[in-house]
């Protein structure tokens, strides 16, 4: 065994465990963990902007199932050759636990669901979008760990020290099962861990969004526009490294084209949107009024923080 082999990144021996007859899938656990973290962070950020944090959980109940459905639909459409061919089983298109979610489908359908929800609540969408943007990119990073367990979304073979080992996995009958099987210990190939590249990129964009939001006091949807631009920039170059089967348009992977188009659109939208940040009264006037009333009625005589105070050490008057 040489030094390069010692330096490679091992894949997990399996991505599915069983609790009796119930399968526990690492891919699903990573998605759930990402959702939980996103809800927690969004509650803090939305409350700091002056919104009612309880709205976040309500929005998540609407957005999460819509996002998962949208993500799966986008994946099946853009990777239809995996489900609709002479040797394919179309029923596999519904087996979401085997992996396969397209982020753009999740953002579009999940975003539409949230937009309808906020319209029903008669609240502006932009402050929530800005609050949720860093949380979404962080959740995406956590979710990418699921690709590691599934041994999917990797790049070309390589001998770099951080190459990922892809194991030969088999099911209980000894048949090849790269996603649901258990490793035999045989290394089929060492490849570029593109899932890891995207995970690290997502964490970088998360940090940049948090910094930019604090430094420039962004609002009116500009944080969300930056999230879209940042993610698509990374997805554009990472997509070039992937070798998994994908739909091509003019010899170019469809997600490469989508990333380029969406990146350009996000940059344009960012500069068109209004500068500055909304006041708590603009974010949720009813909640802001109730917080102000509670502050006046504080039993110990000490005024409570107003809605929106605390974000980046600001008060409404300094925005």
Curated annotation (Swiss-Prot):
Any one GO MF annotation of this record: phosphatidylglycerol-prolipoprotein diacylglyceryl transferase activity
Pathway in which this enzyme or protein is active: Protein modification; lipoprotein biosynthesis (diacylglyceryl transfer)
One Gene Ontology cellular component annotation held by this UniProt entry: plasma membrane
Keywords: Cell membrane, Membrane, Transferase, Transmembrane, Transmembrane helix
Domain of life: Bacteria
One annotated GO biological process: lipoprotein biosynthetic process
Record's subcellular location: Cell membrane
The family this protein is said to belong to: Belongs to the Lgt family.
Protein name: Phosphatidylglycerol--prolipoprotein diacylglyceryl transferase
